[in-house]
């Protein structure tokens, strides 16, 4: 499949829809080192992710089926699924698998690359640069992602955001381990991060 060049101010090509049209557990580790880029110039390298496997995963929002809240997750791959949590935070996922699968990848942390002034302005005063995007709620705030971005197409680059491949491969020595902040499915090793990266949100996962 031919890749179109991204309109975002970061060199590389937009990741095609076929990349996302696979199991979330396959997509998640391969998202590491890709770029989440916004049309306004903000961009960060993806350094931590978690996979959620729909009906096979008791921790997934889609485990018990489709609802108005999680409907986007059952849509076509390569879109944002953005949800509100704890009554105060937004989190963003990339929808994966075929239409109707209800699976996706939570982006947990970014290494800020571009548009840091905008990120700082979007976060609380005196936030350290290391903490701008270190955690799923922090990164959505820093990148300007909220409920209005639920369902945004990440492939077309016409709706403000894209996942960009700038040529940096996923790490060969992947760290994998339990996901964070869930009450069920803790035994599933579906969290991956870039080893040694200081922007990872928690302790490095272990296999």
UniProtKB/Swiss-Prot annotation:
Annotated GO MF terms: alkylbase DNA N-glycosylase activity; DNA binding
- Enumerate the SUPFAM superfamilies for this protein: FMT C-terminal domain-like
Single Gene Ontology BP annotation: base-excision repair
Q: Which domain of life is it from?
A: Bacteria
- InterPro entries this protein is in? Formyl_transferase-like_C_sf, MPG, MPG_sf
- Could you list this entry's UniProt keywords, alphabetically sorted: DNA damage, DNA repair, Hydrolase
Q: What is its EC number?
A: 3.2.2.-
Class of enzymatic activity (EC top level): hydrolase
Look up keyword Hydrolase and say if it applies: yes
Matching PANTHER family: DNA-3-METHYLADENINE GLYCOSYLASE (PTHR10429:SF0)
Family under the similarity heading = Belongs to the DNA glycosylase MPG family.
Name of the protein: Putative 3-methyladenine DNA glycosylase
């Amino acid at each position: 499949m031919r890749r179109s060049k991204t309109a975002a101010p970061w060199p590389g090509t937009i990741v095609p829809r076929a990349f996302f049209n696979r199991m979330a557990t396959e997509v998640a580790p391969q998202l590491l080192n890709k770029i989440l880029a916004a049309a306004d110039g903000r961009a960060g390298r993806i350094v931590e992710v978690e996979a959620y496997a729909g009906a096979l995963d008791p921790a997934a929002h889609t485990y018990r089926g489709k609802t108005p809240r999680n409907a986007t997750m059952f849509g076509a791959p390569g879109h944002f699924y953005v949800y509100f949590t704890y009554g105060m935070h937004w989190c963003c996922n990339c929808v994966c698998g075929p239409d109707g699968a209800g699976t996706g990848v939570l982006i947990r942390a970014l290494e800020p690359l571009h548009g840091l002034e905008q990120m700082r302005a979007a976060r609380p005063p005196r936030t350290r640069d290391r903490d701008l995007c270190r955690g799923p709620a922090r990164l959505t705030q820093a990148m300007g992602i909220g409920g209005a971005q639920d369902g945004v197409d990440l492939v077309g680059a016409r709706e403000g955001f894209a996942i960009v491949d700038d040529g940096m491969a996923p790490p060969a020595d992947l760290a994998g381990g339990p996901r964070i902040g869930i009450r069920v499915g803790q035994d599933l090793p579906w969290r991956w991060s870039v080893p040694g990266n200081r922007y990872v949100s928690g302790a490095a996962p272990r296999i």
